[in-house]
Design a protein with these regions (language model features):
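Short coil/turn connectors at secondary-structure junctions
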Residues: 3-5, 33-34, 40-41, 62-65, ...
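Flexible glycine-/small-residue-rich
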Residues: 9-13, 71, 137, 200
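Acidic low-complexity segments
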Residues: 2-46, 51, 61, 118-119
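Gly-rich Lys/Arg/Thr-decorated short loops/hinges at beta-loop-alpha junctions or inter-strand turns
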Residues: 16, 67-81, 202
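Short, charged, surface-exposed secondary-structure boundary motifs
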Residues: 18-19, 78, 144-149
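Hydrophobic alpha-helical positions that pack around
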Residues: 106, 110-210
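Histidine-anchored nucleotide/phosphate-binding helix
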Residues: 86-102
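Mobile "lid/hinge" segments at catalytic clefts and subdomain interfaces of large enzymes
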Residues: 58, 69-73, 181
Length: 210
């Protein structure tokens, strides 16, 4: 076989967090500085793909007019994003505002949520009051949580085959990703936790855990 570089990581066993570098007013920083904070915190897409968020927030030479947060979670049995939006609605909305600032304040900021999540919708509507963030619910139908499908549902635009949403002036992030980005910038938190759903016959109690 072919040889290649190898990196060996050896833990010191101390389990110590780095010192948090909080930022009380991110609007005093440039978009590039904020993207770097998000990169250094290891924020990646929490909708499943795990794509680095910093890269997605830097659509070079492209003007973004629509930011979409995906709160659809259309897969069966999974309710982690539903729980997240109920318990951390204000952080999700703050994350939407942060991402919009980084992207140059797009004219439209939308959070898309399927209508089978009434408690999450109510919490998000309350948190988004007096902001530019618009909460949009729509009929529950798989696979509406897919990036291209959700874009078509919310904007009536179809992303061409082989193209990225940014070519239409659209950036989409998961609701959990938006919250993680906000907490990385505001509190200096690295991405070390998330809410996830545990289900199955082997469990006495099926639940969401943090």
């Amino acid at each position: 076989g072919m040889s290649g570089p190898c990196v060996v990581l050896i833990s010191d066993g101390q389990h110590q967090f780095v010192d948090y570098q909080a930022c009380s007013d991110y609007r005093q920083l440039s978009g590039a500085e904020l993207i770097d904070k998000i990169r250094q915190a290891g924020i990646a897409g929490l909708g499943g793909a795990g794509f680095p968020t910093a890269i997605k927030l830097d659509p070079r030479n492209t003007s973004i007019d629509t930011l979409i947060l995906n709160g659809t979670e259309c897969e069966p049995y999974i309710t982690a994003d539903d729980r997240l939006m109920q318990d951390y609605a204000s952080d999700v909305v703050a994350g939407a505002e942060l991402l919009a600032f980084i992207l140059g304040e797009p004219s439209s900021i939308i959070v898309g949520i399927e209508d089978n999540k009434p408690d999450a919708i109510k919490a998000m509507q309350a948190a988004a009051k007096n902001t530019r963030v618009k909460i949009v619910s729509f009929p529950t139908k798989y696979p509406s949580g897919g990036e291209r499908q959700l874009i078509q549902i919310l904007t009536n635009k179809e992303v061409p085959s082989g193209k990225l949403p940014a070519t239409l002036g659209i950036v989409m992030q998961n609701v959990g990703t938006a919250m993680a980005a906000y907490r990385a910038v505001r509190f200096g938190e690295a991405l070390t936790w998330r809410i996830t759903t545990l289900v199955g016959e082997a469990l006495k109690v099926e639940r969401n855990i943090k």
